[in-house]
């Protein structure tokens, strides 16, 4: 066997490989000898079929299998000897001319092919003990707890019928019957009876609720609205519609008193128990926000300290995933790049930079995990599947079966677990200091989150 490197540019390598016909023929003959004891051919006793006869019948198919296995074994040897860590699947180019292929399959010609591959660069890891990471922490105040309970009370408030002749106001709940049309034609899903609409809740399409202000019981109005351009039903998105709407009842919200009795309606012993429950929930939310901030800061530090050329094909793959998502979202919403105060060229440049960062960070985290023997156990993955199933009540078995039969989906669950374990490993070594911040500062949006 002869191996010649024909290309070595950065992370890209290409080799021309030549395997003598005699070597292939010997391997194929060995397969045929093994096959002799397994096949049944009329006129021959089991195990007594001459190899030469088998070669006439199965020779080309066995040679094809031999070539396939030889290429895989040879490529593995080439990459192992050179210490390559592959970034992509090897791209093998075989002879295509029919006459040449026939000679190779017949054992009359050497096999010559090329294999191109892109490799992962050698990564020198930083000393994580030199990392300083700020951990923002916000205190949960009594006002935060009271605000959370008020939101809960508002969501559970009851309504009482308004006085006869009273008109609907913002905040009222109006029971309506409606029939929607587009250009005078009714459409699927456009009809409803006994539907409760809380004016100002913004749960219906824009303009629908506002036009109910001032309506009375028994009154019919024609509400003129436009479906949003990003409406889920593409057949309705962006279209003008009219809803012939009749109010059958109008109710006003009753003030919900937050006391022990309210807590009992939620299955709790007292208001104090409710406050403790809400404080615990807020603690979970605050801790999660802190975790995200710390993780983002750590990833920024890893980005700063690990600058290298990432495999172009991986960057292209990551960019294409993001760009296709961006384009689909913009097409759905009807927005243009001008609406975002940018151009398509600038947006592409920005997302390619993000793709490069994501690929590099992925390689760095993988290198850290590999060198420190960080793994994800089957139990950890199973717990993640169980949590996902619990988040979809009534569909638990469907979710469980989906992940059991879908290795790719299971890998997508495993990846964030692995990433978090690597992050925790680094944080154990880094110098992490707490910083008191306000709730608003802790939960503020970070414009750069998409780069994480």
UniProtKB/Swiss-Prot annotation:
<dbReference type="InterPro" id="IPR037041">
    <property type="entry name" value="Trigger_fac_C_sf"/>
</dbReference>
<keyword id="KW-0413">Isomerase</keyword>
<dbReference type="Pfam" id="PF00254">
    <property type="entry name" value="FKBP_C"/>
</dbReference>
<dbReference type="InterPro" id="IPR008880">
    <property type="entry name" value="Trigger_fac_C"/>
</dbReference>
<dbReference type="InterPro" id="IPR008881">
    <property type="entry name" value="Trigger_fac_ribosome-bd_bac"/>
</dbReference>
<comment type="function">
    <text>Involved in protein export. Acts as a chaperone by maintaining the newly synthesized protein in an open conformation. Functions as a peptidyl-prolyl cis-trans isomerase.</text>
</comment>
<keyword id="KW-0143">Chaperone</keyword>
<dbReference type="GO" id="GO:0051301">
    <property type="term" value="P:cell division"/>
</dbReference>
<dbReference type="InterPro" id="IPR001179">
    <property type="entry name" value="PPIase_FKBP_dom"/>
</dbReference>
<dbReference type="InterPro" id="IPR046357">
    <property type="entry name" value="PPIase_dom_sf"/>
</dbReference>
<keyword id="KW-0132">Cell division</keyword>
<dbReference type="InterPro" id="IPR005215">
    <property type="entry name" value="Trig_fac"/>
</dbReference>
<keyword id="KW-0963">Cytoplasm</keyword>
<protein>
    <recommendedName>
        <fullName>Trigger factor</fullName>
        <ecNumber>5.2.1.8</ecNumber>
    </recommendedName>
</protein>
<dbReference type="GO" id="GO:0044183">
    <property type="term" value="F:protein folding chaperone"/>
</dbReference>
<dbReference type="GO" id="GO:0005737">
    <property type="term" value="C:cytoplasm"/>
</dbReference>
<dbReference type="GO" id="GO:0015031">
    <property type="term" value="P:protein transport"/>
</dbReference>
<comment type="similarity">
    <text>Belongs to the FKBP-type PPIase family. Tig subfamily.</text>
</comment>
<dbReference type="InterPro" id="IPR027304">
    <property type="entry name" value="Trigger_fact/SurA_dom_sf"/>
</dbReference>
<feature type="domain" description="PPIase FKBP-type">
    <location>
        <begin position="171"/>
        <end position="256"/>
    </location>
</feature>
<keyword id="KW-0131">Cell cycle</keyword>
<dbReference type="GO" id="GO:0043335">
    <property type="term" value="P:protein unfolding"/>
</dbReference>
<dbReference type="GO" id="GO:0043022">
    <property type="term" value="F:ribosome binding"/>
</dbReference>
<dbReference type="GO" id="GO:0061077">
    <property type="term" value="P:chaperone-mediated protein folding"/>
</dbReference>
<dbReference type="Pfam" id="PF05697">
    <property type="entry name" value="Trigger_N"/>
</dbReference>
<dbReference type="GO" id="GO:0051083">
    <property type="term" value="P:'de novo' cotranslational protein folding"/>
</dbReference>
<keyword id="KW-0697">Rotamase</keyword>
<dbReference type="GO" id="GO:0003755">
    <property type="term" value="F:peptidyl-prolyl cis-trans isomerase activity"/>
</dbReference>
<dbReference type="InterPro" id="IPR036611">
    <property type="entry name" value="Trigger_fac_ribosome-bd_sf"/>
</dbReference>
<dbReference type="Pfam" id="PF05698">
    <property type="entry name" value="Trigger_C"/>
</dbReference>
């Amino acid at each position: 066997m002869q191996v010649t490197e024909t290309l070595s540019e950065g992370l890209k390598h290409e080799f021309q490989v030549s395997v003598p016909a005699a070597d292939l023929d010997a391997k194929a003959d060995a397969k045929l000898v093994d096959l002799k004891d397994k096949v049944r051919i009329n006129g021959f006793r089991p195990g007594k079929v001459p190899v030469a006869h088998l070669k006439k019948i199965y020779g080309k198919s066995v040679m094809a299998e031999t070539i396939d296995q030889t290429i895989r074994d040879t490529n593995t040897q080439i990459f192992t000897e050179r210490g390559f860590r592959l970034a992509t699947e090897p791209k093998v180019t075989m002879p295509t001319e029919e006459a040449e292929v026939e000679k190779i399959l017949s054992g009359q010609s050497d096999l010559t092919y090329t294999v191109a591959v892109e490799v992962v660069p050698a990564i020198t890891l930083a000393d994580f003990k030199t990392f300083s990471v700020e951990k923002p922490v916000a205190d949960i105040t009594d006002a935060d707890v009271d605000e959370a309970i008020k939101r809960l009370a508002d969501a559970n408030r009851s309504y009482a019928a308004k006085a006869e002749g009273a008109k609907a106001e913002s905040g009222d709940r109006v029971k309506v019957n409606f029939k929607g049309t587009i250009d005078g034609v009714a459409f699927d899903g456009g009809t409803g009876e006994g539907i409760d609409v809380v004016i100002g809740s913004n749960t219906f399409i824009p303009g629908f609720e506002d036009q109910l202000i001032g309506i009375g019981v028994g009154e019919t109005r024609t509400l003129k609205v436009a479906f949003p351009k990003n409406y889920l039903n593409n057949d309705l998105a962006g279209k003008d519609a009219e809803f012939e709407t009749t109010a059958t009842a109008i109710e006003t919200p009753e003030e919900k008193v937050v006391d022990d009795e309210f807590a009992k309606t939620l299955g709790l012993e007292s208001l104090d128990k409710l406050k403790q429950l809400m404080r615990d929930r807020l603690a979970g939310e605050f801790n999660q926000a802190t975790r995200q901030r710390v993780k983002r800061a750590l990833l920024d530090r890893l980005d700063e300290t690990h600058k290298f050329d990432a495999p172009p094909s991986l960057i292209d793959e990551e960019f294409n995933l993001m760009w296709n998502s961006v384009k689909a979202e913009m097409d759905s919403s009807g927005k243009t790049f001008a609406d975002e105060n940018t151009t398509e060229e600038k947006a592409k440049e920005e997302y390619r930079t993000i793709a490069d960062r994501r690929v590099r960070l992925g390689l760095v985290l993988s290198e850290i995990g590999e060198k420190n023997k960080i793994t994800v156990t089957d139990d950890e993955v199973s717990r993640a599947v169980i949590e996902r199933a619990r988040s979809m009540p009534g569909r638990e078995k469907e979710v469980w079966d989906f992940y059991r039969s879908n290795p790719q989906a299971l890998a997508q669950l495993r990846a964030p677990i692995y990433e978090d374990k690597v992050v925790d490993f680094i944080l154990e070594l880094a110098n992490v200091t707490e910083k008191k911040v306000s709730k608003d500062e802790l939960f503020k949006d970070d414009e750069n989150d998409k780069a994480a």
